[in-house]
Swiss-Prot record:
Sequence similarity: Belongs to the universal ribosomal protein uL30 family.
The organism's taxonomic lineage, starting at the top: Bacteria, Pseudomonadati, Pseudomonadota, Gammaproteobacteria, Pseudomonadales
Descriptive protein name: Large ribosomal subunit protein uL30
Ribonucleoprotein as UniProt keyword: yes
Annotated keywords: Ribonucleoprotein, Ribosomal protein
Keyword Ribosomal protein (UniProt): yes
Amino acid sequence: MATVKVTLVKSLIGRLANHKACVKGLGLRRIGHTVEVQDTPENRGMINKAHYLLRVEG
C-alpha cells in the first residue's frame, strides 16, 4: 500500500482537542517530526482535519 510522509509544522498549543487527537493519532509528537503513514481513508481523514498544522508529501 502507498505511504504518505506527514510533518508537524505548527504548534498544538491552543488548538482544538479533536485536532490534537488527530495529530497524535498520526504518531506526530513535536514540531519538525516526520512520520510515514499508510495512505488509507482513516489517515487521510485525520490529515484533512488538521491540514493547517501539517505538511504532506507523497
